[in-house]
């Protein structure tokens, strides 16, 4: 029943055909169960394991590698090759792909926990009226039409419509659903508001929320998916994970690379058609097969097999850095997404604020001799911890606040006129509330004021354990005074009173709305000397002025008073709530976190816009935004603050314009948060969404990066990409800075691997065009790509963060990983790497003292060796020395190139290798591994290599070192943009323009 909130009680009961005094009959229960379904959230249909596995191979580069492995395997069989080396290449490729698939399957298997944990917010049992009798049943057996009894402390088992109240007031904490910082009062009256949001439905109790005060009965109007919690569940089912910017760019690069690889492979094969019939191949067909193998080797060389593993490893290392900043990353790709975040949609309650109501101001009458002289105190501390101090109007700390008469009586009244509990939770190492937030705030105030008559009170309190300290002062007052009778809060009186007995004196303490309390007072307690004087009209007007000023600061204001009553009185009535003595006013709020203002400023400096999203009313939220600097100190912020209903009423064009300026979005429901994220994403914004409640989960999952609070619900955490362990909004800023640094390092090692692969492609291509023997075997290329490239590339991820990383604007989502000028730079480096490798191969044949010292012509016509008379054996072309020299040149030149990647533009003389000792260590380890395969015989056989002489190592160094000089020249040109010889590829990147300029 969707409009139950707008129907009267009798209409709702008639709709379900239920008698409120008897409940449903057994036959009605069976009928309603068939009609409406069970009160459970349906489980999402799980993806079969085999589909998850196949999904991991749905990538163009992966498919190319699979084809390369299959072709390599078939060719080995066709040529009759045997032994481990014949099948090593396809085996290694498939092993890599299997490992990547395993990681992907594990990640996706863990991604569905949010939906399971949402069920934790469903109540387990319910007190239900059926067949005229109350019974306790599992909540899953509830059906629409059931009459349910609800009382303080119970969790609402389904969506209910209030039909009867057994107490003067009934309040529910529905923060997990709406984000409201205070509990909400409920009643049985129908709501006539059109397009009512959850906050407007004052007669509806939502599934999963908690009753904090009162007792009543309600009728079930929605179960399972047809509840507010169920709609959140459905939203999460409908949310697909978006690819991160880096994933998108790597996918684009993979597509581009695949096309280039295919083109080069075909070109190499076509260029060598004339060599198919060379006698050395044994026929045209076998020649075609030979050059097809070269094309396959080229594909293996061109594809950076280690790139997925290196990206994953670098992001994983980044998560460890972020964990030290209290940002726990649940989704690896979200690490780099932080770097291009342009908008943070921040939940207000519990994220920007502490979600702990606390008293921040106290107003008392100091004296009344010449008219009322008001004195204001401020109170520090923004949590439920009984830690904080009281300051006078001059900012001076009060050492013993309880010695002030008014503060002394405020503490008594706050403690005794109170039904809440403040306790310490050792498991969470935090103080927690049971009951109303406002009442707990008064309990905490009583602890901060302390007790009178003890000069050593502050130090004595500090010596207590946290468990004892939680309510030490409150317990003192409760032991001094015995509660005799309580007049509960009602909406018409707007106050609560409690009768207490103390030795030979009975006192009635009252608290409530200032206008109600002040109207019932005729005397004032003066803080100066503790005297009680009459309350004059001038004094009344001054007090009213003060509580209105508290309201302007959006403080929730309460007034406290007391009255001495005849000793032995056992009850009090509403008639006794007159002739009260005014004690003071307290102003409380859900305070902003102390570090939020600086964090907001840092976000603005970094070009990141913050939109505050809350279920609270507009004026309260606007006040918070002013305090944290979200409005950038503007007096007029029209066009920057909207309620959900105001925004929805705007035409589409104005909504688009409003999104560009919006800073505050108030009175929202979960669907509005998700809608906001989607609308911003349509404007090409990269959106981070923070939150801690169940109500935030759909938006957290939809956002480019969802950020949950560490103290938030399990649902929010599981739907998020990152969790802030310390609930500190400021940690987001540190995480963004680290995310930007990680992305910069990711670009560096991607460029490093690309330039290395370009070198390998150039090597094979040049060798094929020149017609010389195979320079490198496929297994050698795999070794270089996976081991000798992978280790330094991973270490590049440890490059230090730039000092100005948070002064730059967010990078554009469409920014290419490799832009025009940079592609040119790494193309130059890659070409040199390839030519140096080929040069090393040729050097051994032509110039090395250990080689045959052939002429260029003899080397390029090696296929005809058997047909001519030579001074050297034809078996020389199968010698492992030249390919070993070439492979070693490739490895060493790439180690020098790794040093080039310490910085994109800074010289090695400025940013020295000492700045990243991990990289130095990885280079040393790589060289040790390379030496290992050269000088350990079984490994040398496996990789078709042989030990090198000192002269050969010297040649390797001569051919490798110039890569440092070349890159230093290119860096110099980058730093001096006017000296690039007008080389401009930024507007015409080698990647498709429509992909780069989105």
From Swiss-Prot:
Keywords carried by this UniProt record: ATP-binding, Calcium, Calcium transport, Endosome, Golgi apparatus, Ion transport, Magnesium, Membrane, Metal-binding, Nucleotide-binding, Translocase, Transmembrane, Transmembrane helix, Transport
Subcellular location: Golgi apparatus membrane; Endosome membrane; Prevacuolar compartment membrane
Record: active site: 347 (4-aspartylphosphate intermediate)
Matching Pfam families: Cation_ATPase, Cation_ATPase_C, Cation_ATPase_N, E1-E2_ATPase, Hydrolase
Lumenal side: 70-89, 271-291, 767-776, 841-883, 936-950
Positions with a binding annotation for Ca(2+) 1: 757, 760, 788-789, 894
One MF term in the entry's GO annotations: metal ion binding
Topology relative to the membrane: Multi-pass membrane protein
Binding site for Ca(2+) 2: 300-301, 303, 305, 785, 789
EC class of the enzyme, as a word: translocase
Keyword flag Coiled coil: no
Record lineage: Eukaryota, Viridiplantae, Streptophyta, Embryophyta, Tracheophyta
Binding site for Mg(2+): 692, 696
Function in brief: This magnesium-dependent enzyme catalyzes the hydrolysis of ATP coupled with the translocation of calcium from the cytosol to an endomembrane compartment. Involved in calcium-enhanced root growth, in tolerance to toxic levels of manganese and in secretory processes. Has a crucial role in manganese nutrition, but is not involved in transporting copper, iron or zinc.
Principal localisation: Golgi
Coiled-coil ranges per UniProt: none
SUPFAM superfamilies: Calcium ATPase, transduction domain A (SSF81653), Calcium ATPase, transmembrane domain M (SSF81665), HAD-like (SSF56784), Metal cation-transporting ATPase, ATP-binding domain N (SSF81660)
Family: Belongs to the cation transport ATPase (P-type) (TC 3.A.3) family. Type IIA subfamily.
Catalytically driven reaction(s): Ca(2+)(in) + ATP + H2O = Ca(2+)(out) + ADP + phosphate + H(+)
GO biological processes: calcium ion transport; manganese ion homeostasis; root development
Annotated S-S bridges: none
Enzyme Commission designation: 7.2.2.10
Comment field (misc): ECA3 is functionally distinct from ECA1 and is localized to a separate compartment.
This protein's name: Calcium-transporting ATPase 3, endoplasmic reticulum-type
Any Gene Ontology CC annotation: endosome
Cytoplasmic side: 1-48, 110-250, 310-746, 798-817, 904-916, 972-998
């Amino acid at each position: 029943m969707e409009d139950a909130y707008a129907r009267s009680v009798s209409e709702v009961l008639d709709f379900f055909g239920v008698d409120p005094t008897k409940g449903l009959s057994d036959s009605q229960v069976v009928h309603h169960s068939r009609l409406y379904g069970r009160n459970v959230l349906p489980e999402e249909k799980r993806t079969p394991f085999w589909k998850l596995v196949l999904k991991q191979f749905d990538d163009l580069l992966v498919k190319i590698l699979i084809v390369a492995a299959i072709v390599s395997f078939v060719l080995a069989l066709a040529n009759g090759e045997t032994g481990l080396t014949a099948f090593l290449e396809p085996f290694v490729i498939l092993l890599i792909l299997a490992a990547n698939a395993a990681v992907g399957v594990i990640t996706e298997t863990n991604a569905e926990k949010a939906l399971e944990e949402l069920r934790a917010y469903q109540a387990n049992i319910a007190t239900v009226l059926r067949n005229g009798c109350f019974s306790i049943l599992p909540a899953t057996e509830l059906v629409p039409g059931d009459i349910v009894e609800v009382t303080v402390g119970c969790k609402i088992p389904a969506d209910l419509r209030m039909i009867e109240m057994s107490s003067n007031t009934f309040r529910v904490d529905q923060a997990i659903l709406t984000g409201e910082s205070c509990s909400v009062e409920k009643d049985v009256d129908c709501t006539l508001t059109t397009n009512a949001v959850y906050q407007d439905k004052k007669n509806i109790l939502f599934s999963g929320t908690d009753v904090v005060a009162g007792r009543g009965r309600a009728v079930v109007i929605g179960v399972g998916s047809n509840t507010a919690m169920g709609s959140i569940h459905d939203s999460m089912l409908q949310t697909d994970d978006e690819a991160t910017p880096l994933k998108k760019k790597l996918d684009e690069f993979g597509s581009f690379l695949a096309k280039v690889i295919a083109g080069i492979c075909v070109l190499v094969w076509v260029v060598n058609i004339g060599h198919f019939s060379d006698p050395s191949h044994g026929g045209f067909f076998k020649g075609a097969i030979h050059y097809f193998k070269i094309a396959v080797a080229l594909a293996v060389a061109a594809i950076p097999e280690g790139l997925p593993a290196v990206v994953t490893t670098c992001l994983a290392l980044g998560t460890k850095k972020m964990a030290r900043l209290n940002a726990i990353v649940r989704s690896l790709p979200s690490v780099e997404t932080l770097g291009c975040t342009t908008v943070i949609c921040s939940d207000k309650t519990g994220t920007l604020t502490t979600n702990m109501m606390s008293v921040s101001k106290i107003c008392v009458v100091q004296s009344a001799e010449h008219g009322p002289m008001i004195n204001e105190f401020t109170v520090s501390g923004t949590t439920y911890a009984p830690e904080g101090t009281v300051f006078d109007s001059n900012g001076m700390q009060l050492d013993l606040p309880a010695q002030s008469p008014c503060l002394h009586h405020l503490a008594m009244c706050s403690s005794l006129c109170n039904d809440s509990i403040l306790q310490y939770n050792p498991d969470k190492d935090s103080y927690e509330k049971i009951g109303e937030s406002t009442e707990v705030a008064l309990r905490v105030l009583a602890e901060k004021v302390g007790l009178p008559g003890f000069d050593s009170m502050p130090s004595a309190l500090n010596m207590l354990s946290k468990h004892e300290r939680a309510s030490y002062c409150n317990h003192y007052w409760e032991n001094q005074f015995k509660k005799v009778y309580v007049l509960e809060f009602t909406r018409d009186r707007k106050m609560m009173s409690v009768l207490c007995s103390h030795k030979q004196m009975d006192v009635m303490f009252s608290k409530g709305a200032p206008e109600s309390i002040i109207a019932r007072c005729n005397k004032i307690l003066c803080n100066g000397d503790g005297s009680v004087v009459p309350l004059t009209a001038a004094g009344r007007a001054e007090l009213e002025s003060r509580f209105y000023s508290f309201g302007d600061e959006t403080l929730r204001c309460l007034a406290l008073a007391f009255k001495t009553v005849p000793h032995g009185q056992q009850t009090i009535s509403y008639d006794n709530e007159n002739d009260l003595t005014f004690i003071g006013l307290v102003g409380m709020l859900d305070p902003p976190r102390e570090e939020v203002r600086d964090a907001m400023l840092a976000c603005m400096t970094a070009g990141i816009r913050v939109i505050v999203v809350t279920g609270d009313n507009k004026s309260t939220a606007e006040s918070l935004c002013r305090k944290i600097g979200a409005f950038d100190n503007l007096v007029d912020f029209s066009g920057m603050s909207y309620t959900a209903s105001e925004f929805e009423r705007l035409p589409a064009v104005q909504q688009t314009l409003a999104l560009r300026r919006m800073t505050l979005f108030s009175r929202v429901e979960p669907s509005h948060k998700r809608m906001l994220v989607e609308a911003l994403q349509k404007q090409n914004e990269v959106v981070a969404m923070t939150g801690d409640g169940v109500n935030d989960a759909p938006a957290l999952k939809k956002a480019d990066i969802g950020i949950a609070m560490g103290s938030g619900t399990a649902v929010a955490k599981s739907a998020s990409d990152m969790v802030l362990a310390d609930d500190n909004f400021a940690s987001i800023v540190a995480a963004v800075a680290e995310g930007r640094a990680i992305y910069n390092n990711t670009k560096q090692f991607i460029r490093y691997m690309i330039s290395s692969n370009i070198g390998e492609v150039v090597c094979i291509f040049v060798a094929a065009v020149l017609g010389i023997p195979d320079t490198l075997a496929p297994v050698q290329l795999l070794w270089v790509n996976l081991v000798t490239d992978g280790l330094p590339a991973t270490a590049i991820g440890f490059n230090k963060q730039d000092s100005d990383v948070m002064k730059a604007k967010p990078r554009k989502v469409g920014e290419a990983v490799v832009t025009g000028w940079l592609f040119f730079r790494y193309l130059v480096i890659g070409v040199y790497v390839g030519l140096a490798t080929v040069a090393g191969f040729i050097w051994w044949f032509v110039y090395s003292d250990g080689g045959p010292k052939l002429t260029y012509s003899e080397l390029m016509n090696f296929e005809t060796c058997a047909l001519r008379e030579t001074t050297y054996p034809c078996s020389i072309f199968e010698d492992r020395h030249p390919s070993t020299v070439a492979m070693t040149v490739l490895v060493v030149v790439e180690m020098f190139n790794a040093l080039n990647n310490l910085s994109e533009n800074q010289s090695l003389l400025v940013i020295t290798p000492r700045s990243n000792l991990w990289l130095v260590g990885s280079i040393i380890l790589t060289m040790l591994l390379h030496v290992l395969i050269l000088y350990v015989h079984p490994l040398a056989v496996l990789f078709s290599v042989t030990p090198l002489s000192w002269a050969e190592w010297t040649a390797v160094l001569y051919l490798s070192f110039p890569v440092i000089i070349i890159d230093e020249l290119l860096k110099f040109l980058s730093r001096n943009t006017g000296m690039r010889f007008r080389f401009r590829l930024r507007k015409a990147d080698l990647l498709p323009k429509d992909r780069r300029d989105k």
